[in-house]
Regions:
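Cys-nucleophile CN-hydrolase/nitrilase-fold catalytic domain and related Cys-dependent amidase chemistry
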Residues: 1-77, 81-85, 91-92, 155-163
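Residue-level detection of beta-strand scaffold positions
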Residues: 48-50, 140, 145
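Active-site catalytic loop in hydrolytic enzyme cores
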Residues: 43, 62-143, 151-163
């Protein structure tokens, strides 16, 4: 990508781990600022000379047993320059099905919108279900966002309604 002129790469939500159980997901929760996924992303950014919006990975939240679904941004020197914790968690019952999703049972919600300066422009960070909440995007644009990033991992039963 860098050879073709790219300066920014964006990875999907849950790019590093899409486990089938919450117990498995909890086993890969990383401390803020350190962990194998964060180290790998920092190294990739350095080696490739790219800024990376690293989709999401579970990152511990002090004072909460639930991790954040955190979107981390790494600059081309491998430094973490921004963190956005998904604000709008996906809680839904699927009509006509005996299944649903309760992301809030296993993830702590974020609190603040984040805009980060990158070589591509000012990027407003959001994740997946956030796209259902236009006020978040209005706020990001008011805060100077020129590009809106929406890493997502919708499932087949729910994705069609969102895209």
């Amino acid at each position: 990508a860098r050879a073709a002129g790219a300066c920014l790469a964006v990875l999907p939500e849950n790019f590093a781990f899409m486990g089938r159980s919450e117990a498995a997901r909890r086993s890969v929760v990383e401390a803020p600022g350190d962990g194998p996924v964060q180290r790998a992303m920092a190294e990739a950014a350095r080696e490739l000379g790219l800024w990376i919006v690293a989709g999401t990975t579970p990152v511990a939240v002090p004072g909460d047993a639930r991790p954040a679904n955190a979107c981390l941004v790494f600059d081309d020197r491998g430094r973490t320059v921004a963190r956005y914790d998904k604000i709008h968690l996906f809680d839904v019952d699927l009509p006509g099905r005996d299944e649903g999703y309760r992301e809030s049972a296993n993830a702590a919600p974020g609190r603040e919108p984040v805009v980060v300066d990158t070589p591509a422009g000012r990027v407003g960070l959001t994740v997946c279900y956030d796209l259902r909440f236009p006020e978040l995007y209005r706020r990001l644009v008011a805060d100077g966002a020129e590009i809106l990033s929406v890493p997502a991992a919708f499932t087949a039963p729910t994705g069609r309604a969102h895209w």
